[in-house]
């Protein structure tokens, strides 16, 4: 990736992706070498770093939520620490299904590509990187938005914008 020139702020999306990656390192048990490598030194800007990791490791998916341990569940896009803990606890009392996962806080919009319940996927979808990215990003909507807002520029708000000094 090209670094911004001295004195110019980094692009907001790049900054946001770095914050997300930092979160993965601190709270999700990822190592820096897992997220980026010499072969893949940049994040995919279309998806968050956790989803980017999952898409590069499709051989480890889908994960059966009925048997996967906490550390494995944490690596599934759409499942955070609270949801992973709830899944592990709920398995003691019975079998899990997709509606119960949703109630536990799992973001099925992202997670359903990477998990199974009772050996079945939520929808019959191919486990292919390009297919999943297209579904997650809704490329048509992004291109439409970019076309409609081509002449606009956006910047991060500061406290001064709210009258706070």
Could you tell me what each predicted segment is?
Residues 95:
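Adenosine-cofactor binding site in Rossmann-like domains, unifying the SAM/SAH pocket
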Residues 42-72, 98-165:
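C-terminal extensions
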Residues 1-63, 67-71, 77:
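C-terminal scaffold of the Radical SAM
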